[in-house]
Design a protein with these regions (language model features):
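N-terminal basic, amphipathic alpha-helical segments
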Residues: 1-150, 352, 356-362, 372, ...
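Conserved PLP-binding active-site segment of the aspartate aminotransferase-like
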Residues: 65, 343, 418-423, 440-479
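Active-site PLP attachment segment
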Residues: 88, 315-350, 362-365, 454
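Conserved glycine-rich beta-strand-loop-beta hairpin in the small C-terminal domain of fold type I
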Residues: 371, 388-396, 406-420
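Glycine-centered flexible beta-alpha turn that most often forms the glycine-rich phosphate-binding loop
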Residues: 297
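Short beta-strand "wing" residues that participate in macromolecule-binding interfaces
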Residues: 84-85, 184, 440
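Conserved core of the PLP fold type I
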Residues: 156-290, 302-319, 467, 482-496
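Structural signature of PLP-dependent enzymes
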Residues: 157, 351-358, 374-396
């Protein structure tokens, strides 16, 4: 790892602002908020040990604050032992050593908070969910249940344990991936209990405490949970219109021994970004050059509104540098709890042994039904896509009408609208929205760095009448929140 001469990015104002995006959100003096943001970046590995922080005046200019704010923030970090201030040579991030190892247990304890917080929300008392990106079932789930029951009766003479998955389902998944441009054999497919288990298995198999992993920022909350559970040090890379920032990934790979990169190249959750073929090839090459594993999450890949998504990253990789995971929850029904991992056979065997420790194989009835659904995928998926396209347009129209200050880019596929607030905190808004009967996911819950608290992820998976009522409730909550925010500013004044 080349760290003793590293700077925080190339040193330009925009790059620094990108690393500290959202630092000013919240309450308290600016220097306290800046120190907290820098501390979080150091603890999570966004700023590596041995990094020289930007000079005070330059950072102050980039962040549009007074130099005294940066001086006070650096002094606070020095008191905590996170940085050293060297006369004539600037401020440097200290090697964290035992501190980082000691935090592994703490991070593992905290790991489940995001996914549990999402899954523990309920819709009692008539609350409308605008947070869960899980569509209701397609009609074929009910239509094929009787046929699935007959197949289950037939295979019940078998002991029912297939640790790698029900063979006909593995064959159907392999066919589907091959049709997308990634040649796949049944022996390269492991069936999992949803994509979440697939993510957790790859995290447990390939990452240990204190090791570096790169996650997109923002990303799927369940991935943050899974990698924190391992005690890994998370390096966050921003997401643009074409996916994860590969220039920054290249820089990080040159400076740190990164074990794994988690990326969602097809209709990224939550931004809906789509990575072009050239970028997929480039990421595969970067991983191969640096001996780093890429775990690509293709859970949304089949949900393109217009042109199909490019082949998975693994189609451009040599050897075992890319593992592909996916799910049938977003296409057919979340209640199936069927996901999969596609990897070269030696890697897959390792993952299969690890999965057997957990459950000896996923639910057979769900797998039987999933295999039947995949046989009719070319008939079912276009219906699902048309439904989502219509609901996406409706949600966009509702947000524009009832929340006119909010901004978003129209998605080309996937399940969610990534909306930006004109001001305020999405976490605070979520509490007001809940009191008004609408449940939303603040952007900070999608961020390994706790950024994006000025964003809200809004899925368009609900029925049209539910979307309309939910947005109306959210609009009432926004009006109430803005009133609270205005009163608070009058009482507290501007903090400098």
């Amino acid at each position: 790892m080349q760290s003793n001469q590293a700077e925080m990015g190339p040193g330009s104002g925009p790059e620094i602002e990108r690393r500290l995006r959202g630092w000013a959100a919240g309450k308290g003096p600016l220097h306290v908020r800046l120190a907290a943001a820098l501390k979080a970046a150091i603890e999570r590995g966004d700023v590596l040990p041995g990094t020289r922080l930007p000079p005070e005046r330059r950072l102050a200019k980039a962040l549009s604050v007074g130099r005294s704010t940066v001086v006070a923030a650096y002094a606070s970090l020095a008191k905590q032992g996170l940085v050293a201030r060297r006369q004539g040579s600037g401020t440097w991030v200290e090697p964290v050593g035992d501190y980082a190892r000691g935090r592994a247990g703490e991070l593992a304890t905290r790991a489940q908070h995001r996914l549990f917080a999402v899954s523990s929300f309920d819709e009692r008392h008539g609350a409308i969910s605008l947070f869960a990106a899980t569509p209701d079932s397609v009609a074929a789930v009910g239509e094929l249940s009787a046929q699935a029951a007959e197949e289950i009766d037939r295979v019940s003479e078998h002991h029912g344990y297939w640790p790698l998955g029900y063979p006909p389902l593995r064959q159907e998944i392999a066919k589907r991936l091959t049709a997308r441009g990634l040649r796949t054999a049944e022996a390269e497919v492991l069936v999992t209990t949803g994509a979440q288990q697939a993510i957790a298995l790859t995290a447990a198999a390939f990452v240990g405490p204190g090791e570096f992993v790169v996650l997109e920022d923002p990303t799927y909350p369940g991935a943050i949970d899974a990698y924190r559970q391992t005690g890994a040090r998370i390096l966050s890379a921003p997401v643009g219109p074409t996916g994860i920032d590969l220039d920054l990934v290249r820089e990080v790979l040159a400076r740190a021994d990164v074990k794994l990169i988690y990326a969602t190249p097809s209709f990224q959750n939550p931004t809906s970004a789509l990575m072009p073929i050239g970028e997929r090839h480039r990421l595969a090459q970067l991983a191969s050059d640096h001996g780093t594993l890429v775990v690509e999450d293709e859970a949304h890949a089949e949900l393109a509104f217009d042109a199909a998504a490019p082949p998975p990253i693994a189609a451009f990789a040599d050897g075992a540098s890319v593992v592909t995971i996916g799910s049938l929850s977003k296409v057919f029904w979340g209640g199936l709890r069927v996901g999969w991992i596609r990897a070269p056979q030696p890697v897959l065997s390792h993952l299969g042994r690890l999965k057997a420790v957990f459950d000896l194989g996923s639910s057979l009835p769900s797998q039987v039904l999933a295999a039947l659904l995949l046989q009719r995928a070319d008939e079912i998926i276009p219906i699902r896509i048309e439904e989502l396209r219509s609901r996406s347009a409706l949600l966009g129209s509702l947000v524009s009408t009832h929340l006119p200050g909010w901004s978003f880019a129209e998605p080309a596929g996937g399940l969610v609208l990534w909306t930006k607030l004109p001001h305020g905190s999405a976490s605070e808004l979520a509490e007001v929205a809940r009191a008004n009967g609408a449940l939303i996911l603040p952007g900070s819950m999608t961020s390994p760095s706790d950024w994006f608290d000025d964003h809200v992820r809004l899925p368009y998976v609900a029925r049209p009448e539910v979307l309309e009522q939910g947005v109306r409730r959210l609009a009432r909550a926004w009006q109430a929140y803005c009133g609270q925010d205005t009163r608070r500013e009058r009482e507290v004044g501007v903090i400098g």
